[in-house]
């Protein structure tokens, strides 16, 4: 597991760590100070994940703007 202030290697790693933190917090077995530390790390991971998603969305927009014939459409999983 990465150090507490270290950014995870990937979006998927951050998401996995965030899920583990949520599980530990939901168990209710953590002492208050440890729960606060875990919550703080979770907020940090969530923000990093959101930033990575925004960067990916910007890259997609740039790629689509290079091809003027293609227009961005909202993703709907039902179209698979």
From Swiss-Prot:
Gene3D superfamilies: Exonuclease VII, small subunit. One of its GO terms (cellular component) is exodeoxyribonuclease VII complex. GO terms for biological process: DNA catabolic process. GO terms for molecular function: exodeoxyribonuclease VII activity. Pfam families: Exonuc_VII_S. It is found in: Cytoplasm. Keywords: Cytoplasm, Exonuclease, Hydrolase, Nuclease. Its main location: cytoplasm. Signal peptide: none annotated. It catalyses: Exonucleolytic cleavage in either 5'- to 3'- or 3'- to 5'-direction to yield nucleoside 5'-phosphates. Its EC number is 3.1.11.6. It is an enzyme of class 3 (hydrolase). Bidirectionally degrades single-stranded DNA into large acid-insoluble oligonucleotides, which are then degraded further into small acid-soluble oligonucleotides. HAMAP family: Exonuc_7_S (MF_00337). Belongs to the XseB family. Heterooligomer composed of large and small subunits. This is Exodeoxyribonuclease 7 small subunit. It comes from Citrobacter koseri (strain ATCC BAA-895 / CDC 4225-83 / SGSC4696). The lineage of its organism: Bacteria, Pseudomonadati, Pseudomonadota, Gammaproteobacteria, Enterobacterales.
């Amino acid at each position: 597991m990465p150090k507490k202030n270290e950014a995870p290697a990937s979006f998927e790693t951050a998401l996995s760590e965030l899920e583990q933190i949520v599980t530990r917090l939901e168990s209710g077995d953590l002492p208050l100070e440890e729960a606060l530390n875990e919550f703080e790390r979770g907020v940090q991971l969530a923000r990093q994940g959101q930033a990575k998603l925004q960067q990916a969305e910007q890259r997609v927009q740039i790629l689509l703007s290079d091809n003027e014939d293609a227009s961005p459409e909202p993703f709907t999983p039902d179209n698979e």
